[in-house]
Amino acid sequence: MRRRLLAFGTAFTTIGTAGFLGFGVAAADDTKPVDPAPGGAHAEAPSMGTPGRGYALGGAHVLGIPYDEYIMRTGADWFPGLDRQIVDYPAGQVQGHTLERLFPGIGALGERFMPGLGLDGPSYGESIDVGAPNLINAIRQGGPGTVIGLSEGASVLDEVQARLAYDPAAPPPDSLSFATYGNPVGKHAFGESFLTQMFPVGSVVPSLDYRIPAPVESQYDTYQFVSAYDSIADWPDRPDNWISVANAIVGLATGHTAVAFTNPSMVPPQNIRTTVNSRGAKDTTIMIPEEHLPLVLPFKYLGVDKDTLNKLDGVLKPYVDAGYSRNDDPLTAPITVDPVNGYDPAAVTAPATQAAFGGGTDPVSQLLAGLQYVVNNQPAPKP
């Protein structure tokens, strides 16, 4: 029952959308399902990264997620064999910067009732300012390796690459690689982030206390991992398409974090693109498809059969994809939904959640396990 309640809202929206377009679920029988990658071919595990250390930074520190476990598992199937270490930084949350300024004193009130809730604290920008020197110091002490950042952590990587770009004391180009997952200010081969579309370079995002950085040509190879339709890293470049926007908003919940736990078998070859910059460094984009559209995935968690899910994808996907200019030419468009090899966000996230909290593999069990952990392991209130 709880599982159904969790998915009901999104499922209802999807049904309404399909109905508005004149294609009910039952009427989808004549709709061609979304095709998987041609011939079932998917990418071999490419040779990526720099051996040695794995310098890892997570996203915003949110209650109810196994934070350290997530960081240590980020990109583990893409960059195996690294000697991983967590690079500490504040990892401030949006509400921590915003709410305390709108409602002075709310942070202290929140700490009384739920320590660690984060109603006050360092901003996104302040977190980057602390994280960048921490990461540079870790690299100088630890030596060669691959630097991995998820979400907010990716912004720390951007700042570090900018600082090292023309630093004569920077490590040699062949001693470091950088890998971002769900970069909030990333521009990739198939599109770009919400923030870079909405805010010009040099402008400050008020709720983040963060200035949009100018692009920098790094001397280090960079890998950008993007979950298709993640509203943070893969915002529609035609935002007047409300179906694309709705799908991307749900894509934040389904794929923004889960992309960190994917593996090469989930990616068709045409979703990997590499360019070489003027300094000889490679910039590789890896776009990873989910097995269904974010708007459709909740139906899977409601128990809807695979055939119906594929038909729903077939109904909605042309409308969703119209919001992205990358799909104008079918010959160069990436595969963004793959019902055969695409990833299930709940399934790829479950091992990290179970390792930290226990519980089942379904989304509701993971959520409840996280909430139970928060209730049972609250830090002591501040005096």
Swiss-Prot record:
GO terms for molecular function: acyltransferase activity. It is found in: Cell envelope; Secreted, Cell wall. Disruption phenotype: Change in bacterial surface properties resulting in lack of sliding motility, altered biofilm formation, rough colony phenotype, slower growth rate and enhanced susceptibility to antimicrobial drugs including rifampicin and erythromycin. Loss of trehalose polyphleates (TPP) production. Its EC number is 2.3.1.-. Proteolytic cleavage of the signal peptide is required for export to the cell envelope and for production of trehalose polyphleates (TPP). Residues 80-325 form the PE-PPE domain. Keywords: Acyltransferase, Cell wall, Lipid biosynthesis, Lipid metabolism, Secreted, Signal, Transferase. This is Acyltransferase PE. The gene is pE.
